[in-house]
UniProtKB/Swiss-Prot annotation:
One Pfam family this sequence matches: EF-hand_8
EF-hand domain boundaries: 40-58, 66-93, 94-129, 142-177
Residue sites binding Ca(2+) 2 per the record: D155, D157, D159, Y161, E166
Family per similarity comment: Belongs to the recoverin family.
GO molecular function, one term: calcium ion binding
Name this polypeptide is given: Calcium-binding protein NCSA
Keywords associated with the record: Calcium, Developmental protein, Metal-binding, Repeat
Binding site for Ca(2+) 1: D107, D109, N111, Y113, E118
PROSITE patterns per UniProt: EF_HAND_1 (PS00018), EF_HAND_2 (PS50222)
GO biological process: regulation of signal transduction; sorocarp development
Biological role stated in the UniProt entry: May prevent cells from entering development prematurely in the presence of environmental nutrients.
């Protein structure tokens, strides 16, 4: 994406506007910075981790998860389109886009289901970042309590796995999760 001169073509801008929540001015500014940070036009995992660290996301496990979600075509690099779409989902996505993004983070192996083991890995990593979890009601949880509550409220069919549809339904019923998704807009 982008021509030899390092600028976005009109068609590329239109494509990205249609697949993101950024306008043409923002896309051009993002592209300029992206090309400055990565003249090759792609970001490898190490470069992505450096960018995430600069943005305040220092946990390596979380950086790996984010990289895997951004890298849609699974070629071990992130191109500009993947970067824009991932950034758009996190920062400006609709509630449904944010729910799907979060599900992709939790579904570490990409099989379409969240397991207790995957949730435990995620929450332990997040717990390291924030130290404790507090809900909107002020109630504190440790990661294992959250996992139990998470599966109790979302695993509708009781099979020990949470599908995307179960996750969507459960998320929309949980004010703590909705509040967390809103925080991503700030």
């Amino acid at each position: 994406m982008g021509n030899q001169l390092g600028t976005l073509k009109k068609e590329e801008v239109e494509l990205l506007q249609n697949s993101s929540h950024f306008d043409s001015r923002e896309l051009r500014a993002l592209y300029k910075q992206f090309r400055k940070d990565s003249p090759s036009g792609t970001i490898n995992k190490q470069e992505f981790k450096e960018i995430m660290t600069q943005m305040g996301v220092g946990d390596q496990f979380l950086q790996d998860l984010l990289f895997n979600v951004f890298d849609k075509n699974k070629d071990s690099t992130i191109n500009f389109q993947e970067f824009v779409c991932g950034l758009s989902s996190i920062t400006r996505g609709t509630p449904e886009e944010k729910i799907e993004f979060a599900f992709s983070l939790y579904d570490i192996d990409g099989n379409g289901y969240i397991t207790r083991s995957e949730m435990e890995s995620i929450l332990e990593s997040m717990y390291k970042l924030v130290g404790t979890f507090v809900t909107c009601s002020g109630k504190k949880f440790d990661p294992h309590d959250l996992i139990e509550e998470f599966f109790d409220s979302m695993d509708d069919d009781g099979d020990g796995y949470i599908s995307l549809e179960e996750y969507k339904r459960g998320t929309l019923k949980n004010p703590d999760i909705i509040q967390g998704l809103k925080l991503l807009n700030q």
